[in-house]
Amino acid sequence: MARRGRVQLRRIEDKASRQVRFSKRRAGLFKKAFELALLCDVEVALLVFSPVGKLYEYSSSSIEGTYDRYQQFAGARRDLNEGSTSINSDENASIHSRLRDITAWSLQNNADESDANQLEKLEKLLTNALRDTKSKKMLAKQNGEGSRSRANSSGSRGQEEGSA
């Protein structure tokens, strides 16, 4: 049995062919949305605007209710991000301050002429600053991944339909 080749993704130039393809793909997308809602017991809302601006919509419940839920989720996520941004800016200011102190200390105490004790002190400061930076980086990565996984599991479903 012959396999079909991959469909090359590019704009279809012929207007009639483009309209036929749009209709078929739209029907397939709506069928998938229905199946997803039915099989997985999830809330799905799908809005599609045709090239001429006609609206096609599907919702497993109500579009308005789903949109309201999305707005609440997006608002809570935005508030969370704004709160973490202010915390991060305070932490960044602290790190920059420590870095300025270390730089000033190393300039004052010319590292080439320093004794072993002074160099050990500088090494300890730099090691601590590096450790703190790495831990903050790890925490930021974990928070970023956590918010993405929460977004995928708690109701943000627009990304999955758009990427299909």
Curated annotation (Swiss-Prot):
Record domain MADS-box: where: 2-62
Keyword hit for Transmembrane: no
Keyword Magnesium: no
Family matches, as InterPro entries: MADS-box/MEF2_TF, MEF2-like_N, TF_MADSbox, TF_MADSbox_sf
Distribution of this protein across tissues and organs: Widely expressed.
Listed Gene3D superfamilies: Transcription factor, MADS-box (3.40.1810.10)
UniProt GO molecular function: DNA-binding transcription factor activity, RNA polymerase II-specific; protein dimerization activity; RNA polymerase II cis-regulatory region sequence-specific DNA binding
Pfam families: SRF-TF
Knockout mutant characteristics: Late flowering under short day (SD) conditions.
Note: Plant over-expressing MADS50 have an early flowering phenotype under short day (SD) conditions.
Protein name per Swiss-Prot or TrEMBL: MADS-box transcription factor 51
Organism: Oryza sativa subsp. japonica
Lineage: Eukaryota, Viridiplantae, Streptophyta, Embryophyta, Tracheophyta
